[in-house]
Each structure stands twice: as structure tokens, then as C-alpha cells.
Swiss-Prot record:
The gene is rplI. The keyword Ribonucleoprotein applies. Belongs to the bacterial ribosomal protein bL9 family. PANTHER family: 50S RIBOSOMAL PROTEIN L9 (PTHR21368). It comes from the Bacteria. Binds to the 23S rRNA. This is Large ribosomal subunit protein bL9. GO terms for molecular function: rRNA binding; structural constituent of ribosome. GO terms for biological process: translation. The lineage of its organism: Bacteria, Pseudomonadati, Pseudomonadota, Betaproteobacteria, Burkholderiales.
Length: 150
């Protein structure tokens, strides 16, 4: 199925690109999340009329994400978990825990925006974590996991 992208989609294209994707991906993800529309002649004509408006909205989202990223970049977040004597945690620190800790400091993030490349954190110490605020804005945050003896 051919679709017109209404915003930048990672590994697919930019705003206004007409791309061919699998039907299920278009019907179940791109179209319901308003990231794309079917590429019919009328849809293409309507898109060209609204193109400047959509580009302006995308630029505003990017500027807001960059401003938020400047505040968030290099931030140190401290999370306390129960741990054993050897520094291993009972349980783990997940992206939801990190998003919740950042929300406590006044940053609104979804847990899907926190990227843990090696999975949940299972050791006490400082761990670098990436936070994707926008497809083009990724900042680094240091998560300090402090062990609480049982």
C-alpha cells in the first residue's frame, strides 16, 4: 500500500514522502496513529494544500524537543533500590522507573522514550541512558542506582 507520511517516521521517510509499506503496517500503525494517509489522488492534493501548515507544526515540535533536550542533557537521576552485598539489585530498574523518576523532577516522558540498550539495570552504580524526545533529538542522562541494604 502506498501512503503519504504526515510526519517523519524512523527508517521510513520524512514529511510528505510517498512510500510503499505493507498493508498491515499501514492499517494497524501508521494510519491510526495519524503518521500517514493512503496515497490517493485526492489525498495527495489535500496534502499539498496543507503541506506548509504540517511543516510548521513539525518544526514547532522539533524546536520544543530541542529546548527540552537542552534542559535534560547531562542530567543525573538517582534511583534507590534494594540490593545485596555484592551490588546486585533485587529486581531491576526499568525504563518505566526512570521515566517516573524524571517525572518527579518535572519532566514529562513516556516510558517508551527511555532507551536502555542492554536491558533493565541490575547493578548498583552510574549508568548512561539515552532519552529520545523526538526522532532527531536524543539526549544522554546518567542514572545513579543506589543500593539500599536489606
Amino acid at each position: 500500500m502506498q501512503v503519504i507520511l504526515l510526519e517523519k517516521v524512523i527508517n521510513l521517510g520524512n514529511l510528505g514522502d510517498i512510500v510503499k509499506v505493507k498493508d498491515g503496517y499501514a492499517r494497524n500503525f501508521l494510519i491510526p496513529s495519524k503518521k500517514a494517509r493512503r496515497a490517493t489522488q485526492t489525498a495527495i492534493a489535500e496534502f499539498e494544500v496543507k503541506r506548509a501548515e504540517l511543516e510548521k507544526a513539525a518544526a514547532e515540535k522539533l524546536a520544543a524537543a530541542q529546548a527540552e533536550g537542552e534542559k535534560l542533557n547531562g542530567l543525573n537521576v538517582q534511583i534507590t533500590q534494594k540490593s545485596g552485598v555484592d551490588g546486585r539489585l533485587f529486581g531491576s530498574v526499568t525504563n518505566a522507573d526512570i521515566a517516573e523518576a524524571l517525572a518527579g523532577q518535572g519532566y514529562k516522558l513516556e516510558k517508551s522514550q527511555v532507551r536502555l540498550p542492554n536491558g533493565p539495570l541490575k547493578m548498583v552504580g552510574d549508568h548512561p541512558v539515552s532519552v529520545a524526545l523526538h526522532t532527531d533529538v536524543v539526549v544522554d542522562v546518567t542514572v545513579s542506582v543506589v543500593g539500599e541494604s536489606v
